[in-house]
Curated annotation (Swiss-Prot):
InterPro entries: Ribosomal_bS16, Ribosomal_bS16_CS, Ribosomal_bS16_dom_sf. It comes from Mycobacterium leprae (strain TN). This is Small ribosomal subunit protein bS16. The keyword Ribosomal protein applies. GO terms for cellular component: cytoplasm; small ribosomal subunit. GO terms for biological process: translation. Keywords: Ribonucleoprotein, Ribosomal protein. The keyword Secreted does not apply. Disulfide bonds: none annotated. One of its GO terms (molecular function) is structural constituent of ribosome. Residues 115-139 are annotated as: Disordered. Belongs to the bacterial ribosomal protein bS16 family. Residues 124-134 have a biased composition (Basic residues).
Amino acid sequence: MAVKIKLTRLGKIRNPQYRVIVADARTRRDGRSIEVIGRYHPKEEPSLIDINSERTQYWLSVGAKPTEPVLKLLKITGDWQKFKGLPGAEGRLKVAPPKPSKLELFNAALAVADGGPTTEATRPKKKVSAKKAAKAVESDAEGAKATKAYALAEGDEQSE
C-alpha cells in the first residue's frame, strides 16, 4: 500500500488550518487517515507548525512519501534533513513570543490606574423614585418576616 504524508484542510473560508496526516495515497484530501502527526496554521504570525518528529521519522523510515507542501514543512522543522542525514537538522522554525497571562495584564492595568478610577462616571446615576424606594423597603420587611416565621417553624419541628 502506497502511503503519503499530506495535509487535510480545516478552518473557515479565509482562515485555513491544516492537519498533517499519514494516509493511503488513493484517499481524497479530507478522507480517512491512518494517523494524525501534526498541525499547520499558516495565517498566524509566525505560522504555527507543530509536527511530531518521532512519528514523522517512523513513517518516513517505512516508506511514506511526503507531498510537496509537507516536504517544505518538514524542511522548516528539520525533520527531512534528520531523515536524510543532511546538515541543518535543527531547522529554521520561528517561535512566537509567549503571551502574557491575563493576571499579569490585569495587575499592570491596576497599577497604571493606581487602584481606582481617575475620573467620575460618564453618566450620572439614575435617581430612584420615592415610590420604588418605599416598595423596596416593604419587600425587605416582608422578606424578614417570612424568614423569621420559617425559622420558628423549623424550631418547632426540631423540638418534637
